């Protein structure tokens, strides 16, 4: 978990352009002891590769993979530019978060920040806030608790002909949850409820509100109070904006009808907007693709941006979910939400497309992911096959075969082992040492046993292939030095691997 202090936050900053804003972020990171002086070039180089603008006025400049060694300790520096900074392609950044992180710290840190910043209203607040403590609290999510209504807060079929009884039931329930103080109770009991119409009434208080909460009670039979119908009472405790969408829904005719006639589940769904606000991935006829991420560093900003660009080529609505983390379903066109999924190497992603070009979209995404989304990927195929299916079909078919799942730039060769004793521990170790010389991912397969491709950098896995004299081994390499790796492997096998 990222620790952010007020000293890391710089409000009401000024910069003439994006480069100066990045320079300010790096200077603050250097002064805080997070990075070495040369880190600036890494941040500028990253911007040339892919813009770090996430959306909602937020940019997250950070270094390239080559500059991670210059990071002394993980940290961030946050700058607020109320006037906005042009960040390219017409995007305006109001909050710039300079990040220094190594290895997977980069993804976890981004995930934490984007979880807070994915809300447009929150991002808009951060662009204008003048109090450092409040800015820090919102950025760290300390004041952004999701608004929920427990099922216990819905009381139905109350046998009463008293409006005050319904109010008291609600107030008591809110008090049990520590959502209100005693003065709130006194206020709603002693002051008249307000009629919404259709037999619904509302009570609240300007004092004694502790946290956002709502309770609803409904009489078994309708009755009259001062000449007006009474069927149900809503009692509200409000301390933050998170409850506002629910308050707006109280004015909706359909929601009011549900309050008057629905069961507890239907009422909760209507009040929280669950039926319309939550993404779904179970539409009949939708095309579903399940793919494994093979990028060594997962889906950080650059491959995520490439994924978004691929998605935007198609007109279909496309959502995605990180199955490995059991994440929520998000739009595959939102860079911020994709980065927030915290996808690392080996994670399984589920895409659902709905529309005329849904099948083409999912097939294209599968190929783009298999090819690394602009980065080098492991030559070892995923442990589970990538699949594409159509919702409602009974057949669940692999999207690609193992060979099809190899990156397009993979280089492979087949060599015959000549060692009299095959590949026991010693020659296997020499083979592994040769493979590790190269900046490449190398997988190996025993063709004679039709084994799976396994990492050629694992001594245990090579020995487990059961290679004897005359065995044909297939090597597949990807990466900058793939060809050199294949050539080196061929040479060392030809020389007998030290025997």
Curated annotation (Swiss-Prot):
Q: Region (M domain): which ranges?
A: 155-285
Q: Where is this region: Linker?
A: 378-409
Q: Where are the transmembrane segments?
A: none
Where is this chain primarily localised? cytoplasm
Where found, per UniProt? Cytoplasm
PTS EIIA type-2 domain: from which residue to which, for each copy?
Answer: 2-142
Q: Which GO terms describe its molecular function?
A: kinase activity; protein-phosphocysteine-sugar phosphotransferase activity
Locate the Phosphohistidine modifications and list their residues: 62, 300, 424
Highest taxon of source = Bacteria
* Domain comment (free text): The PTS EIIA type-2 domain is phosphorylated by phospho-HPr on a histidyl residue. Then, it transfers the phosphoryl group to the PTS EIIB type-2 domain.
The protein's name: Multiphosphoryl transfer protein
- Gene name of the record: fruB
């Amino acid at each position: 978990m990222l620790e952010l202090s007020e000293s890391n936050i710089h409000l009401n900053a000024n910069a003439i352009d994006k480069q100066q804003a990045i320079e300010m972020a790096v200077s603050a990171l250097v002064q805080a002891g997070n990075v070495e002086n040369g880190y600036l070039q890494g941040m500028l180089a990253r911007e040339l590769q892919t813009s770090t603008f996430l959306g909602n006025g937020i940019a997250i400049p950070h270094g390239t993979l080559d500059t991670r060694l210059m990071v002394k300790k993980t940290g961030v520096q946050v700058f607020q530019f109320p006037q906005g900074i042009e960040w390219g392609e017409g995007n305006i950044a109001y909050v710039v978060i300079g990040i220094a992180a190594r290895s997977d710290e980069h993804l976890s840190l981004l995930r934490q920040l984007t979880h807070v910043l994915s809300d447009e209203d929150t991002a808009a607040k951060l662009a204008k806030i003048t109090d450092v403590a409040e800015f820090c609290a919102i950025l760290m999510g300390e004041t952004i608790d999701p608004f929920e209504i427990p099922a216990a807060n819905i009381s139905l079929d109350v046998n009463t002909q008293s409006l005050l009884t319904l109010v008291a039931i609600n107030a008591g329930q809110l008090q049990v949850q520590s959502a209100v103080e005693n003065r709130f109770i006194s206020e709603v009991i002693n002051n008249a409820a307000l009629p919404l119409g259709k037999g619904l009434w509302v009570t609240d208080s300007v004092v004694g509100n502790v946290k956002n909460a709502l309770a609803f009670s409904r009489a078994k039979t309708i009755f009259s109070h001062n000449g007006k119908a009474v069927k149900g009472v809503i009692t509200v405790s409000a301390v933050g904006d998170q409850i506002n969408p629910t308050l707006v829904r109280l004015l909706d005719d359909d929601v009011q009808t549900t309050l008057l006639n629905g069961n507890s589940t239907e009422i909760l769904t209507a009040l929280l907007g669950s039926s319309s606000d939550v993404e779904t991935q179970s539409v009949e006829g939708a095309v579903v693709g399940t793919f494994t991420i093979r990028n060594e560093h997962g889906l950080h900003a650059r491959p995520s941006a490439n994924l978004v660009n691929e998605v935007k080529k198609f007109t279909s609505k496309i959502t995605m979910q990180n199955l490995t983390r059991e994440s929520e379903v998000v739009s595959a066109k939102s860079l911020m939400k994709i980065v927030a999924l915290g996808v690392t190497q080996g994670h399984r992603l589920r895409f659902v497309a709905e529309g005329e070009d849904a099948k083409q979209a999912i097939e294209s995404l599968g190929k783009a992911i298999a090819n690394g989304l602009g980065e080098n990927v492991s030559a070892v195929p995923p442990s589970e096959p990538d699949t594409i299916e159509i919702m409602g079909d009974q057949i669940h078919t692999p999207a690609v075969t193992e060979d099809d799942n190899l990156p397009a730039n993979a280089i492979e060769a087949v060599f015959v082992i000549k060692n009299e004793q095959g590949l026991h521990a010693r020659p296997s170790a020499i083979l592994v040492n040769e493979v590790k010389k190269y900046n490449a991912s190398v997988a190996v397969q025993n063709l004679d046993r039709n084994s799976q491709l396994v990492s050629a950098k694992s001594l245990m896995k090579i020995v487990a292939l059961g290679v004897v004299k005359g065995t044909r081994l297939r090597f597949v390499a990807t990466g900058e030095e793939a060809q050199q790796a294949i050539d080196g492997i061929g040479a060392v096998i030809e020389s007998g691997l030290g025997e």
